[in-house]
Amino acid sequence: MKQIVMQGPRKSRVVEVPMPEFTDDQLLVKVTYTGMCHSEWYPWSVAKEGEVFGHEAVGVVAEAGRNVQGFKPGDRVTGLGGGGYKEYIVMDPVKTCHVPDNLKDEDAIVEPLACLLSCAVKMMPATPGDPIAVVGCGYMGLGMISLFRLCGYGKIVAVDKRPEALENAKRFGATECCLPGEIPSEYILNWETMGKVDLTRDSNNEKLFAMGLPNVMEFTGTEDGLRLAGDLVSAHGRLGIGGYHNDSFRNLDYKLWNFKAFTSINCHERRVLYEAGLCQRCLDLLSSGLWKFTGVTDHIYSMEEFDKANEEMEAH
């Protein structure tokens, strides 16, 4: 079978490898699609020879181990697991779920969806009608906007430097869309905006708490995006960090963050079985039409185009 294997930084090739072996308690799955995750862009750019990537697979059960229950050959499945950039993978039934009949394969890649649902849980509780901003409107940001709409948030402010991303944000439920340089001043609480307000006469903090937004979610994965998200959070607000910051250290104004006394929430999830439990919920929400987040895929690449796909992701 074929597999994408790295040859070094930014360079891969498709090679022939043996079919994977699976036990009586595992599934052998023929992969139809594997989603590209921005968390793997930096590792791709500095990869060592022999490294493999891919953790967002969807496919069809080719064979089921004799002890496996609930799955059979021909079932469409998705779930959690690595090494997905190859024709066949081995999956653990505990971390695998069925794809509903009314969902396309490309809409049912569940790993990032489970990450989004975990983010929504960590940003709770939310009172219906609460405002929130989403900084970074790529795939994850758009999914978060649509999920926040389902959760009952009111004003949803989308922020991105790409006009086309803001158009997509409107499609998935954003009520306001802003380029970074065009954000209304009342949504920003930093040293500059505070310097324009006489806070010495603000003994009860009414002026201070009128600035910024109480809930902000960051999905840029960049230092500039994270700093901007921090500027948007109101005093005693909440900042959810969903962007994957794995390329270098971040230089942040923690003096400002400290003064604003907001809560910073790491929205990533490392409890594999907990995340696995969210997977079927995500697909059920999509299948029922409650979570309106389908038809997002805009590029499908061959295995031979893996490097091109990463280069295009880098450009955006």
Model-identified regions with their sequence ranges:
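Residue-level marker of beta-strand positions
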Residues: 3, 56-58, 76, 88, ...
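Glycine-rich beta-strand-centered segment in the early N-terminal region that forms part
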Residues: 18-35, 42-83, 100
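NAD(P)H dinucleotide-binding glycine-rich loop of Rossmann-like/cofactor-binding domains
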Residues: 33, 77-135
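C-terminal substrate-binding/catalytic core of Rossmann-like NAD(P)-dependent dehydrogenases/reductases
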Residues: 197-206, 248-298, 307-308
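ADP-ribose/adenylate-binding Rossmann-like module
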Residues: 231-249, 265
